[in-house]
Amino acid sequence: MERPRHQGMTKNTYMRWRLPLICLLWEVAMIILFGVFVHFGPEADAHWEEEKREMNLTSDIENDFYFRYPSFQDVHVMIFVGFGFLMTFLKRYGFGAVGFNFLLAAFGIQWALLMQGWFHSFQNGKILIGVENLINADFCVGSVCVAFGAILGKTSPVQLLIMTLFQVTLFAVNEYILLNLLHVKDAGGSMTIHTFGAYFGLTVTRFLYRPNLEQSKDKEGSVYHSDLFAMIGTLYLWMYWPSFNSAISEHGDAQHRAAINTYCSLAACVLTTMAFSSMLQKKGKLDMVHIQNATLAGGVAVGTSAEMMLTPYGSLIVGFICGIVSTVGYVYLTPILESKLHIQDTCGIHNLHGMPGLIGGIVGAITAAAATEDVYGKEGFIKAFDFTGSYKTRTPSIQGGFQAAGIVVSLLMAFAGGTLVGAILKLPIWGDPADENCFEDDIYWEVPEDEESDVYHMHNPDKAASP
């Protein structure tokens, strides 16, 4: 006999037709669009041998694959393992955290290859893709994973897929405006990935505000083993963040510099986070929420300026500041956002991605405005900011102004896009869980028998107590 489901469930969360239909329809659409538009780039095409002769290359080692693929591997692990496991801290939402992150990322990278391809690598009616396109698609999906953190445990998989469709589209537009029209530098995505993703997600979760979410408060916390799983995600993200911030930088000194700056900022951020986590607790004990999240803020904040001459000590300062800002945000700001602004931020993305992303954009603007030929050298100065062609007359101060404008554009795109998507997801047709069933795997997943029994008894205490 099938076990009775949770009492009090007032919403239809039945996914048997909704989820398969949208997944299959969208995958068929991807197959058709890829068939029409997508082709291998020159360095992935079988005509590479002719390309080598034309470019006077003697070895396959000059193929961009061998420069970019190690970084791509690291970024790929961050998206699917790092972000996925970071969100497993919820005691009863481990399947949803990893599984839905897997789902939206797998769909998102396909749509991102198309959207970014139409903007950046569309030639003669075809999108030409190579390993750098794969990295950029992962970056785009990283922004979606950030937004997912704000609504974790409160949405259906169908809502997540719809959000991914819109967010990837808006990300590609925002990225094109910043990188191509404003000509800003944002190698590690402080503005395009973190600022946009965080404030997009926060706007969406504001529209999806649940006044009775207190009914699920008992499941919103963590247990010992769920925090350990989340810490696995933290460590993967922390270790690979230098690759993330340097993955698409120019070969040579820029990529080298980006990795060093990120490395230093992350290290400083850990010590500051530990210090303030202890300082802000009455008994001086460390809070695992801070260690899992705030320790990564240094990587976020150094993203825009990573390939600039920020210097190692400058990176340490950025990491130091972000450790403080992020930890203080978790302690004081997150409760205020929920009680005063009705922003229910499950993972605290405002503290890990939002504020550090803004700091990163500001640091990038200041570093660009302060750049001189004495520091960079004449050729290095031109190369670092790509002051060529129509931008050859641009000065550091003007570049700094455009960098600051990039922050504003990202925020406007995030708020406008989040408002649109939040309004769509608010419609009562997507199978989202009832307030009392949020943060619960059992709504959308088959869970092991003993776990399911625990959930049933938790919602039916009278029967649990009966002999």
Swiss-Prot record:
Subcellular locations according to the entry: Apical cell membrane
Protein topology in the membrane: Multi-pass membrane protein
Glycan-bearing residues: N56
Keywords: Ammonia transport, Cell membrane, Glycoprotein, Membrane, Transmembrane, Transmembrane helix, Transport
Stored Pfam families: Ammonium_transp
Cellular component aspect of the GO annotation: apical plasma membrane; basolateral plasma membrane; plasma membrane
Cytoplasmic side: 1-20, 91-94, 154-159, 210-227, 281-293, 337-351, 426-467
GO molecular function: ammonium channel activity; ankyrin binding; carbon dioxide transmembrane transporter activity; identical protein binding
A Gene Ontology biological process term: ammonium transmembrane transport
Extracellular-facing ranges: 42-69, 116-132, 181-186, 249-259, 315, 373-404
InterPro entries in the cross-refs: Ammonium/urea_transptr (IPR029020), NH4_transpt_AmtB-like_dom (IPR024041), RhesusRHD (IPR002229)
Cited Gene3D superfamilies: Ammonium transporter AmtB like domains
Transmembrane segments: 21-41, 70-90, 95-115, 133-153, 160-180, 187-209, 228-248, 260-280, 294-314, 316-336, 352-372, 405-425
Superkingdom: Eukaryota
Subunit structure of this chain's protein: Homotrimer.
UniProt family annotation: Belongs to the ammonium transporter (TC 2.A.49) family. Rh subfamily.
Function: Functions as an ammonia transporter.
Protein name: Ammonium transporter Rh type C
